[in-house]
Amino acid sequence: MEKYKVIVDTNLWISLLIGKKLSELYSVCNSEIVDVYICNELKEEFMRVASQEKIRKYVTNERVIQTLELMEASCIFSSIKKTVVSSELRDINDLYLLAFAETIKADFILTGDKDLLSLQSHNQTKIVTYREFDEIIKK
């Protein structure tokens, strides 16, 4: 059985970090039908956001380290080898996710970002919420 290639956007990692109803993300990361991919840029964005004061008041250093350890233990690391220029995306800081999706030929980007979700897809990659993806893999 072929596995789904999935990229989990930083906003979902942060939601997992602060415990907002995404504890199931742990099981997705360890699923037999899903390979979650990570790149330096995504990890750096996670660290940058996790260190912001508005996030730090909800989490301990230990929790940040646990989430990073989950990423490193459960995800496949890859580098971005493509460049994407998109006039459809308002936040140019998210272009790396599209480039990463092209590089690994991702099946899905999981996100809560409304701008990314409005694209619905990028080349072969579907852009969906965690809940939508959960419904897809339960079928």
Language-model features and meaning:
Residues S15-L16, V49, Y58, L119, ...:
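Residues that scaffold the ATP/ADP-binding catalytic core of kinase and kinase-like folds
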